[in-house]
Amino acid sequence: MLVIGNGRMITQDASNPFLENGAVAMDGNTIVMVGVTEEVKKVYPDAEFVDAKGGVIMPAFINAHEHIYSSFARGLSINGYNPQGFLDILDGLWWTVDRHLTLEQTKLSAYATYIDSIKNGVTTVFDHHASFGHITGSLNAIEEAAKDLGVRTCLCYEISDRDGMEKSRESVMENVNFIKHALADDSDMIAGMMGMHASFTISDETMALCNELKPEGVGYHIHVAEGIYDLHQCLKEHGKRIVDRLHDWNILGPKTLLGHCIYVNEHEMDLIKDTDTMVVHNPESNMGNACGCPPTMRMVQK
């Protein structure tokens, strides 16, 4: 039995949202009592007590769109690198990084990200991974770090045709194999999704392969309209907007995550809402890559 108390408690309970001097009692993985510190200690006098010392006690955060592979690129300066737009940033930085990662480097990147997450109150991480220099086994390498540190995590590999169809197919199988592995895990700490980069690097052939091989019961995790080129390419090559294309491929739904959604219109927002698809807002990334601002509040209103 464990009691954490003497903290300002945010409960997420509408009837009692805040306690100035709150405590929470836990029996294993189950919260058994929430209340004023002295009252909780009276009920569980023999429990181990952790003094929050006036800090905040609240449910942990969930990071719904992470890129573990980028953790060691923070603050990286590349000689001669002078991007003129988002595509230059992708090819000159992020795709260059992911093409050179080894399994060991992927695992170390996961440790760095998960430790940073724990320090900042994040206990669940949805990671969208890419390491095109070493695809097979990369999700298991990340899983090892997550299990070692006790972080709940949902992993996927970023399927893309950008480095050729052979690597694209290998990426599909990395997702499929990890999803099956995660579905067989009964720890409630590991899950998998079918990861996709973005519409502009995924052909209809690859879309069809993902649809065919994705195990039942899981969704997709994909970047949508992060840059304007993604939208322009989809209109030119497929004659439709990105969310419409995803809908036509049965990718939308309550288990699917759409990252960014900067350049979406009213119709696409309605389609996202009608299919109960989830959107992840990434303001720090959008600023860092100078991609723009999504219609976040409009989506919230809908």
Where do the protein language model's features map onto the residues?
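Active-site-adjacent C-terminal substructures of enzyme catalytic domains
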Residues: 251-302
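Active-site gating loops and adjacent loop-to-helix segments of metal-dependent hydrolytic enzymes
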Residues: 72-106, 163-164, 228-255, 275-278
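Divalent metal-coordination and catalytic microenvironments
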Residues: 7, 24, 29, 54, ...
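N-terminal metal-binding scaffold of metallo-dependent hydrolase/deaminase domains
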Residues: 1-43, 55-57
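Alpha-helical scaffold segments that flank or form the walls of functional sites
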Residues: 76-128, 133-151, 173-186
